[in-house]
């Protein structure tokens, strides 16, 4: 130091580096983006499930066939409402399709707010109920469709699908569509559980 100088020299601290700013990572944004992707896929799957559930209900509900030959006293006709199992199937698949339509706003909330656990938890509970109803209706209808195709010799139930081909074809298509809906529901439950697990 020079004599008479009023200047004081202060050495810089070694712990502070010049010209660097701390980097701020944004893990929440990445996590939110990941959950948002799951929510968008959930919404798309719900739209697909609506289509398959409505197709199953419509196919079964319009499955009636009248054979071209008839007698003076009998007209040979097969319709879904002849069997209570098929009536249950149509009602159950209509309920499932209605639930899926009503669940779309909750799926949209999950897209807008991917970190919200409430809508996901509600969807898991209601999806499980809808999956159970869907599986019950599909399994019951599948048993009747099997009997219509193959009959049962032990109880003398004859196969009717050789005569009522269109009726059986529509019923079989409805059962296949219902089981596709079951598979979509399983994917929806896995997605929702996965999103909640990483919450």
Curated annotation (Swiss-Prot):
Topological type in the membrane: Multi-pass membrane protein
Gene Ontology BP, a term: cell wall modification
Keyword Ligase set for record: no
Extracellular side: 59-87, 142-173
Keywords attached to this entry: Cell membrane, Cell wall biogenesis/degradation, Glycoprotein, Membrane, Transmembrane, Transmembrane helix
Glycosylation sites: 152
Gene Ontology CC terms, in alphabetical order: Casparian strip; plasma membrane
Compartment list: Cell membrane
Keyword Ligase in annotation: no
Cytoplasmic-side segments: 1-37, 109-120, 195-199
Classification via Pfam families: CASP_dom (PF04535)
Coiled-coil intervals: none
Major place of residence: membrane
Job description of the protein: Regulates membrane-cell wall junctions and localized cell wall deposition. Required for establishment of the Casparian strip membrane domain (CSD) and the subsequent formation of Casparian strips, a cell wall modification of the root endodermis that determines an apoplastic barrier between the intraorganismal apoplasm and the extraorganismal apoplasm and prevents lateral diffusion.
Complexes and interactors: Homodimer and heterodimers.
Name of the molecule in the record: Casparian strip membrane protein 2
Provenance organism: Populus trichocarpa (Western balsam poplar)
